[in-house]
Swiss-Prot record:
It catalyses: L-threonine = 2-oxobutanoate + NH4(+); L-serine = pyruvate + NH4(+). Keywords: Amino-acid biosynthesis, Branched-chain amino acid biosynthesis, Isoleucine biosynthesis, Lyase, Pyridoxal phosphate. Its EC number is 4.3.1.19, 4.3.1.17. Homotetramer. It holds the Pfam family PALP. Belongs to the serine/threonine dehydratase family. Transmembrane segments: none annotated. The modification N6-(pyridoxal phosphate)lysine is found at K51. This is L-threonine ammonia-lyase. GO terms for molecular function: L-serine ammonia-lyase activity; pyridoxal phosphate binding; threonine deaminase activity. Optimum temperature is 90 degrees Celsius with L-threonine as substrate. Activity is not detected at 50 or 60 degrees Celsius. It increases from 70 to 90 degrees Celsius, peaks at 90 degrees Celsius and decreases from 90 to 95 degrees Celsius. Optimum pH is 9.0 with L-threonine as substrate. It comes from Thermotoga maritima (strain ATCC 43589 / DSM 3109 / JCM 10099 / NBRC 100826 / MSB8).
Length: 401
């Protein structure tokens, strides 16, 4: 088992290597939840996530002979970059097996850190099996993403920093995939103050740790794709499972919409960029946990989110909150008809983002044109006002988003 001394040793090992990330007070989250909320900003860590802590601590404990053989790992992103950077610092070869679906940006970043990247399999499990075959063939040391004592101790330094920076913290909320992060953090927290409540958060689409705890042993779940791909682990480790069972007080799961809303909330309200896995703790305090009157630290585990994904989340969030709307209607196919429609929209204070004019669709009567408007609006009441006024003026209106 991992001890507090193991984590303190890891902290000494990591000194001057990793960033001691800020534990930042969030006034907006505190106001919304009624708690006193602090964010542990591992999204600002080297490589954009906490993974460098465990990877570096693991490699630091290898013998010279083991380092000469190099290291191998399997990852879809964050662990890959953590291992690649740690290997680069030590000047040893690293081979990273990534699934073919891994984002191109993460593949490129891993290669730029000097690692040899091999794309193998369509899912993480297939990449993992390929990495084990490489280990067996080459003799390289396998750096497990979570089920390893030195990796867990490295991640546990986050717990030490939280306790040092906020000694009277009452609740610590941590994302959970394979369990390496929360295992280390919970050992550190509970060893220093057993009264602090440690809560883990998974996604409803991949609740492997929650399912395992219910069944009493580490078990595999098939799950579904999730925005929180960084914690999409089908089976927790045997070691991490035992540590979570011993030290973690509660586990909750959040759904995809709650994760997307949390990403947008952090971006817009707190000015924090978080990936899906990094945002699940915030999703939990916004939707699942009562933290009113409590002093709470939430680990923002990473910020490696694809720009295209941010764009989709923002647009969906704008539609959901009534700040963007898509309207379909019909106008007479004559000069000035479109201008008249747009004039009404302008008078109502909506900004036209795009217009699509269609005479040819089979549902369009002869002599008419179908108009699709993308509008920037204030809120849902504004959308309702636009719909009401257009209907009153004789337009057939359909809100499509």
């Amino acid at each position: 088992m991992i001890t507090l001394e193991d984590i303190k040793e890891a902290q000494r090992t990591l000194k001057n290597v990793v960033h001691r990330t800020a534990l930042a007070y969030s006034s907006v989250l505190s106001e919304v939840t009624g708690g006193e909320i602090y964010l542990k900003m591992e999204n600002l860590q080297k490589t954009g996530s906490f993974k460098i802590r465990g990877a570096y601590n693991k490699i630091a404990h290898l013998s010279e002979e083991e380092r000469k053989r190099g290291v191998v790992a399997a990852s879809a992103g964050n662990h890959a970059q953590g291992v690649a950077l740690a290997a680069q610092i030590f000047g040893i070869p690293a081979t990273i097996v990534m699934p073919r679906y891994a984002p191109l940006s993460k593949i490129t970043k891993t290669r730029n850190l000097g690692a040899q990247v091999i794309l193998e399999g369509n899912i993480f499990d297939e990449a993992y099996e390929a990495a084990l075959r490489i280990q067996e063939k080459t003799g390289a040391v396998f750096v497990h993403p979570f089920n390893d004592p030195h990796v867990i101790a490295g991640q546990g330094t986050i717990g030490l920093e939280i306790m040092e920076d906020l000694p009277d913290v009452e609740v610590v909320v941590v994302p959970v995939g394979g369990g390496g992060l929360i295992s280390g953090v919970s050992v550190a927290i509970k060893s220093m103050n057993p009264e602090v409540k440690v809560i883990g958060v998974q996604t409803e689409n991949m609740p492997s740790m929650i399912a395992s705890l219910r069944r009493g042993r580490a078990e595999r779940v098939e799950g579904k794709p999730t925005l929180a791909d960084g914690i999409a682990v089908k089976k927790p480790g045997d070691l991490t499972f035992e540590l979570v069972k011993k030290y973690v007080d509660e586990m909750v799961a959040v759904n995809e919409e709650e994760i997307a809303d949390a990403i947008l909330f952090l971006l817009e309200q707190a000015k924090v960029v978080a990936e899906g896995a990094g945002a699940v703790g915030v999703a939990a305090v916004l939707n699942k946990l009562d933290v009113k009157g409590k002093k709470v630290a939430i680990v923002i585990s990473g910020g490696n989110i694809d720009v295209n994904m941010i764009d989709r989340i923002i647009n969906k969030g704008l539609v959901k909150s009534g700040r963007k709307v898509f309207i379909e209607t019909f106008v007479m196919d004559r000069p000035g008809a479109l201008k008249e429609l747009l004039g009404i929209v302008a008078e109502l204070g909506a900004n036209v983002l795009s217009v699509f004019h269609n005479r040819s669709a089979k549902e369009v009567p002869i002599g008419f044109a179908k108009i699709e408007l993308e509008l920037e609006t204030v809120d849902e009441k504004h959308v309702e006002e636009i719909e009401r006024v257009l209907i009153a003026k004789g337009y057939e209106v359909r809100i499509v988003g």
